[in-house]
Amino acid sequence: MKLSQLFWGELKNEAANTRRILAAVPLDKGDFKPHEKSFSLKRLAVHVAEINGWWKETLLQDELDFSKGDYKPVEINSTEDLLALHDRLVANAEKILSEVSEEEFAKPWSMRNGEQIYFTMPKGEVARTWCLNHLYHH
């Protein structure tokens, strides 16, 4: 079995569980923060949905450079918006995983901020750590 198939099987199962949790997020309490340094509930829900988009950055690019400052959090206004974001990004991850070569998982990928490199590791390790384990973390 290919690594991409293993990743997709795991993501598919986790995505179903994540979707159920996102559907239960009380967005009328979206401003709630358990601590002043915490994300708001709404921002955390969007973050969890957006993690499914990281497959694109991981497998179709060779680095993520924060100095480019091109990230803007998605604005959602309803549970339907949140679930649509989640579903769209999971479908895109499925497409990417169905098309990626096995060789791509061995290529190096870096997270950086301009000249400062936080880490470089094979894309397969990045996918496991940041696309799956980070999702479980939340």
List PLM regions with ranges.
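Short, conserved clusters of charged catalytic residues that mark active-site
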Residues: 2, 77, 88, 126, ...
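Basic/polar N-terminal segments that are highly enriched at the extreme N-terminus
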Residues: 1-8
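Acidic catalytic patch
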Residues: 99-115
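Helix-adjacent hinge/juxtasegments
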Residues: 57, 62-101
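Short, contiguous alpha-helical
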Residues: 8-23, 27-72, 111-138
